[in-house]
Curated annotation (Swiss-Prot):
Organism: Caenorhabditis elegans
Entry's Gene Ontology molecular function annotations: RNA binding
Keywords assigned: RNA-binding
Region of interest (Disordered), ranges: 261-311
Top-level lineage group: Eukaryota
PANTHER family with a match to the protein in the record: HOMOLOGOUS TO DROSOPHILA SQD (SQUID) PROTEIN, RNA-BINDING PROTEIN R05D3.8-RELATED
Comp. bias intervals (Polar residues): 261-270
Protein name in the entry: Putative RNA-binding protein R05D3.8
Keyword RNA-binding part of the UniProt annotation: yes
Segments traversing the membrane: none
Length: 311
């Protein structure tokens, strides 16, 4: 089965047709999924003098597709012929009339790509960086398949805190620092400003393992966490798995034999009653154990399987 590819770093206004057209140059696509950005209304009932890092009264509620959000509107540029005097223009702005709708964002910043065959997947993964709509994007194996087969240790934790507008390093260290020493907190930004996720680096990879089993809430919002793994680490883990599979093919299981095992042990009609003397029994090495005590061979060739047994 061809692996699914996770693409991140897409522009907010990139369309599904653009993403599909770009990746079709590597091979025939089976699937192209471009999730739309989530749309929320923000309600803040707290006092204005309260610090934003300590606010707990901010609520986020999803809106209908037909509703228009504040960040999807822009003020019309002042035009004397259209708006008259500047005072009338400002009055219209106050009444909510002098606004125009901006193009709605079509992308949440990531996509899932699946090719029909492995050739398209291999061609796409040859390059770490791809450019779509003048935005540099990264591609990697999708998480669900990557975690099932590979166990890659990492001290870095990916944290998405959407729909919160922003978080501080102090808040993150306060909530995540209880699980291990934090050495660095890196906030990610693009040309439009800071994004809603960051990378937390711990001193020990075991801290990341523990956090992946926990549910962390900040300001009543559940943090989305995943292991931040470099592509080089994934390749090393895949190489180790291939080496292990190759060793398993070469290594024979215990008591391996090329002969059929008889339904009952081979016994000798000349079995000796003396159990103290042990002699080499080639049939035991061929999978015929357990055997009763056998007398020594008179023909040395029969011990190596070149002649008939004497019993």
């Amino acid at each position: 089965m061809v692996k699914r590819i996770f693409v991140q770093g897409l522009d907010s206004y990139t369309t599904e047709s653009t993403v599909k057209k770009y990746f079709e140059q590597f091979g025939t696509l089976y699937e192209c999924i471009l999730p739309p950005p989530p749309r929320y209304s923000v309600f803040d009932n707290g006092p204005d003098e309260e610090k934003i890092s300590t606010r707990s009264s901010i609520r986020y509620e999803p809106v209908e597709n037909d509703d228009v959000l504040d960040d999807e509107l822009d003020v019309e540029r002042y035009d004397v012929e259209k708006h008259g005097d500047f005072e009338s223009y400002m009055k219209k702005i106050g009444e909510g009339e002098a606004f125009i709708k901006e193009p709605r964002k079509t992308s949440a910043g990531y996509a899932y790509i699946t090719f029909v065959d492995s050739n398209g997947y291999s061609n796409c993964m040859k390059s770490d960086i791809h450019e779509i709509d003048r935005a540099k994007c990264t591609v990697e194996p999708a998480k669900d398949e990557n975690d099932k087969k590979l166990k890659v240790e990492s001290k870095r934790l990916f944290v998405s805190y959407f729909p919160l507008d922003r978080l501080t390093s102090k808040e993150l260290k306060m909530n995540f620092g209880a699980y291990g020493k934090i050495t660095d907190v890196e906030f990610v930004s693009d040309s439009e400003g800071p994004l809603h996720f960051c990378i937390i680096t711990f001193a020990d990879s075991r801290s990341v393992d523990v956090l992946l089993t926990k549910s962390i809430y900040i300001r009543d919002v559940l943090m989305f966490t995943r292991r931040a793994v470099l592509k080089e680490s994934v390749k090393i883990a895949e190489h180790k798995i291939k080496e292990q599979e190759q060793q398993n093919l070469v290594q024979l299981p215990p008591n391996h034999t090329a002969y059929l095992t008889p339904s009952r042990p081979v016994t000798s009609v000349h079995a000796s009653s003396s159990a103290s003397s042990n002699h080499y029994d080639p049939s035991a090495a061929a999978g015929y154990a357990p055997l009763y005590h056998q007398p020594p061979e008179s023909d040395p060739l029969s011990q190596c399987g070149y002649g008939p047994r004497k019993w």
